[in-house]
Amino acid sequence: MLEEPEAATRTAAAVDCKDRPGFPVKRLIQARLPFKRLNLVPKEKVEEDTSPKAAVESKVPDLQLSLGTFESQCHTGSHVGLSTKLVGGQGPIDSFLRATIKPVPSVVIIDLTENCSDIPDSPEGHSELSPDTAGVVTTVEGAAKQQEHSAAELCLLETPSDITCHMEEEPGSPGDPKRTGDCQAGSLQSCPELTPGSRTCPTKELSSWSKAGDLLFIEKVPVVVLEDILATKPSIASLPMMSLDRSVTSESEILESCPEDDSILSHSSTNSSSPTSSPEGPSTPPEHRGGRSSPSTPACRVAKNFVKGSTEKGRSKLHRDREQQREEKEKLREEIRRAKEEARKKKEEEKELKEKERREKREKDEKEKAEKQRLKEEKRKERQEALEAKLEEKRKKEEEKRLREEEKRLREEEKRIKAEKAEITRFFQKPKTPQAPKTLAGSCGKFAPFEIKEHMVLAPRCRAALDQDLCDQLDQLLQQQSVASTFLSDLKSRLPLRSGPTRVCGHDTDIMNRDVVIVESSKVDGVSERKKFGRMKLLQFSENHRPAYWGTWNKKTAIIRPRNPWAQDKDLLDYEVDSDDEWEEEEPGESLSHSEGDEDDDVGEDEDEDDGFFVPHGYLSEDEGVTEECADPENHKVHQKLKAKEWDELLAKGKRFRVLQPVHVGCVWASEAANCTSSDLKLLQQFTACLLDVASPDEPEPGASRREKRDQHILAQLLPLLHGNVNGSKVIIHEFQEQCRRGLLTLPSPTPHLQMPNLEDAVAVPSKARLKRLISENSAYEKRPNFRMCWYVHPEVLKSFGQECLPVPCQWTYITTMPSAPREDSGSASTEGPGQSTPMLLKRKPAATMCITQFMKKRRYDGQVGSGDMDGFQADTEEDEEDDTDCMIIDVPDVGSDVSEAPIPAPTLCK
């Protein structure tokens, strides 16, 4: 805070600040910061001030300007040079300590503690300062006039603020100045004018100034204008000594206002561009403001000690004021912080209360919602349980009903099956043999009577039967016994008696041979005991085509054992012969219903001719030996119905059946041939054995067996027919067998590795299974670029037989009927060989006739092609299944007629 002696206001004597040493003529410009500086004194304190100085200031509002406001109103351009050179090695402080006061330029004093928020509207309002000190006597009226004069010189649009000098005076102490501590609450102050030569902003520089709100800018740079308050030049002649002393005291207080910034002042004084007038002088009258300059006043001498004491006093007072302001500021901050904290706490409490209410409400809603959901879920579960109970009860009822219906259906099915079986087997039922009367054993002492069953024999009471001779011998020995030897020692020296087995050795031959009827009794004395028959055995394999074997097998081997089951007993079995290949499937017989038109012819025939209807003993059909459960139930039902129908037809014809009794004849031994009856000999002579001369067997060649030779011979004859043939395997096999039966096949040119087998093998017709196996192993049914789908023999097979040049398609002359079109080209014209164009005589069966075997398997329609026809050997799978369902009727020429002249019979296939 800057203070001024009170004498300055009373006598209106101005103090010439240029005579004061230590303050160079400098001008500082401080950049305006974007934030507003804090006001150290609250506004309430200024408003509550009731001192007379405040009253005077209230009357003159133009004088109520703080030092910061005054400093901010003094602007200068940045281009003005502010530095001052040293003269004679002396600085501005050296001139301050001189005894003689010399006139110096205006000094810039920066008060950083004041509020610099107020910015003057124009820097030219204070450009002039009158040197005349007599105008200081002018009071508030002069200051008002000065402000009116300065208002006319504004460069900006707004009215400039009043410039005041914070110099106050207390009436009670004329020599003791006192500070107020607040720049905004100052007393009545003089308002000097700036000299014309010390203008801070010339007229030509007004274009660079701009204002935005309360801020002043120079070329977009915010500035704070600081003005020297000690730059006035009062006259020493009109200024009393007391005023000078007070002025010096005021100067010391001014220096104390910024003790911390001494270094800044000294450093910044060299950077000042232009001096600025200070408001420390008296007011000049209006008539001296025309740019006139007054002469300088003589300087006054000031004691050095007096200045030093005043400086220390001002520093202490300034320090106290700052401490007081700091405390007040801290208190104010604490109150504000406390108020904010209370407001924040109150707000948080309200927020917590609202949050708590909201949370309670939400929890309550959630509980109500959960309760409703629980009740709803319970109701849903109850409904679900009730529905499930109803469904379960309904399901149980339906299950019970279904079980009852199933049981009823099974009972009806069993009854029906039993009835059908009884209907079929009632003709084969054996007469019931009368059961032997039960034999009851008599009383056996302690045992109760019991039944003696068929295979039981009552044991005798005494097994050892003693003869009378043995009894007499025992009596003699008892009489002749001596005392020297005891009976016990004699018993020990003898051997015990031995007896035969206690079990019954003999079997009841009558039970075993009850079905055997001996036509004529013959003597069998001297004949050894026959070997007992073993149990019946079933030998059936799934991969074989021949029927299963059902009979006895009494041969025993010493080589094949459980520990070596894969051993080969070549003495007992022939491993080179495959019985499955030798099996010949018989042609299906004619249906029994075909003889309906011949009933009249068969009436007079003997009934014994029907004996051939029965299957020979030991023969089983293909499906025999398999349990009924494995068969198809639908086919089984149809089969049973057809059999019952056929039996009804046979019974309607009047045919009678009787159970055949086996006849047991022989053996007739050579020694007893004379005693044998003629009927037995006549019967046995039909089966007389013929002895044949067997040629010595050829030594087997190493590397090839008889079966392989036979296959090679058949394959050599089959290749011309097979290679390039478009027909199925059934047609090829049938044609080849027919050629073999007629003896039309001849062996091609002999190869070095192939020799002619035995005559029997060459004449025999190969079986269908063997031919099919040879076809599948040595050829493939496929399509090649050179021709369409047909059979192609493997090249290595053709090369081994030397027949690589066989044509495709084959040029075979058929002797059997051919299908109308190939299998893969049903719409194209059939390619027939030379022998296929011969007309055949066909004999059709009646339309109403049906084979009994067609119901055993699923029927395949004519022309149906399987899915595997286009892929190798699977092309004729349907033909294999049709083997058992086809029957063929052939017209056989009369015996004795020439076969070559008679027309070839045409077989008729019936499905």
Swiss-Prot record:
GO terms for biological process: DNA repair; DNA replication; DNA replication-dependent chromatin assembly; nucleosome assembly. GO terms for cellular component: CAF-1 complex; chromatin; nucleus. Residues 639-911 are annotated as: Binds to p60. Residues 186-200, 827-839 have a biased composition (Polar residues). Residues 166-200, 250-408, 578-618, 819-843, 866-886 are annotated as: Disordered. InterPro entries: CAF-1_p150_acidic, CAF1-p150_C2, CAF1_p150_N, CAF1A_DD. Keywords: Cell cycle, Chaperone, Chromatin regulator, DNA damage, DNA repair, DNA replication, Nucleus, Phosphoprotein. Its main location: nucleus. Residues 176-327 are annotated as: Binds CBX1 and CBX3 chromo shadow domains. GO terms for molecular function: chromo shadow domain binding; identical protein binding. Pfam families: CAF1-p150_C2, CAF1-p150_N, CAF1A_acidic, CAF1A_dimeriz. Residues 621-657 are annotated as: Necessary for homodimerization and competence for chromatin assembly. The modification Phosphoserine is found at S190, S208, S293, S776. A motif (PxVxL motif) lies at residues 217-230. Disulfide bonds: none annotated. Residues 1-31 are annotated as: Binds PCNA. It is found in: Nucleus. Homodimer. Part of the CAF-1 complex that contains RBBP4, CHAF1B and CHAF1A. CHAF1A binds directly to CHAF1B. Only minor amounts of RBBP4 are complexed with CHAF1A and CHAF1B in G1 phase. Interacts with PCNA; the interaction is direct. Interacts (via the PxVxL motif) with CBX5; the interaction is direct. Interacts with MBD1. Interacts with histones H3.1, H3.2 and H3.1t. Contains one Pro-Xaa-Val-Xaa-Leu (PxVxL) motif, which is required for interaction with chromoshadow domains. This motif requires additional residues -7, -6, +4 and +5 of the central Val which contact the chromoshadow domain. Acts as a component of the histone chaperone complex chromatin assembly factor 1 (CAF-1), which assembles histone octamers onto DNA during replication and repair. CAF-1 performs the first step of the nucleosome assembly process, bringing newly synthesized histones H3 and H4 to replicating DNA; histones H2A/H2B can bind to this chromatin precursor subsequent to DNA replication to complete the histone octamer. It may play a role in heterochromatin maintenance in proliferating cells by bringing newly synthesized cbx proteins to heterochromatic DNA replication foci. This is Chromatin assembly factor 1 subunit A.
